[in-house]
């Protein structure tokens, strides 16, 4: 056990290596960003003149980016709950970081596309709008809320309301023409939409 080894021999020449090895265990086996950061900090504090300390400090400086990349890697491996846990840690630990809005949006995206849990997707996208106004993810989250109501839940009244918010808030957004088109044709059969009729004929 590396923790026991470090307690018994904190000044051993291999101690910094053992401490840094714990970082990689929590990174690659336990997927626990909180303990990764704790062990990175212990490496820099307890072994300040070691090569591992320099490496650990660089990782601390880039830690928010690492969390996002790690969460996306976990998602690709279908480890969705661990991915969400990493993203929630990012939001809690770095609430004002520029990547926190992205973390919140990815959580919504996981619920939407991977877990197909649309109620939770709506909640998570809503948190992007509530907590990260002016972020680039805000407009995408507002669009996705309208999209879920229109195309998945078939709640056209709520879809119209959410899409109207999008048009009002983001009149010059690249998605606005598509949103306007969708609002005009909410609930219509594809055969009743002249611009799309050729698709079924």
Each language-model region and where it sits:
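Acidic, polar-rich low-complexity tracts and alpha-helical solenoid repeat scaffolds
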Residues: 1-201
């Amino acid at each position: 056990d590396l923790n026991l080894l470090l307690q018994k021999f904190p000044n051993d020449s291999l101690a910094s290596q053992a401490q840094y090895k714990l970082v990689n265990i929590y990174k690659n086996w336990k997927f626990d960003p909180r303990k990764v950061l704790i062990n990175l900090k212990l490496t820099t504090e307890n072994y300040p003149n070691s090569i591992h300390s320099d490496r650990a400090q660089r990782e601390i400086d880039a830690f928010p980016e690492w969390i996002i990349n790690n969460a996306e890697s976990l998602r690709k491996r279908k480890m969705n709950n661990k991915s969400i846990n990493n993203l929630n840690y990012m939001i809690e630990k770095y609430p004002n970081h520029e990547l926190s809005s992205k973390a919140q949006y990815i959580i919504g995206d996981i619920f939407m596309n991977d877990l197909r849990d649309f109620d939770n997707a709506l909640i998570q996208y809503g948190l992007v709008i509530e907590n990260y106004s002016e972020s680039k993810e805000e407009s995408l989250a507002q669009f996705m809320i309208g999209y879920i109501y229109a195309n998945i839940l078939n709640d056209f009244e709520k879809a119209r309301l959410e899409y109207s918010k999008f048009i009002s808030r983001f009149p010059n957004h690249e998605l606005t023409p598509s949103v306007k088109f969708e609002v005009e044709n909410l609930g219509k059969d594809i055969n009743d939409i002249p611009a799309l009729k050729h698709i079924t004929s």
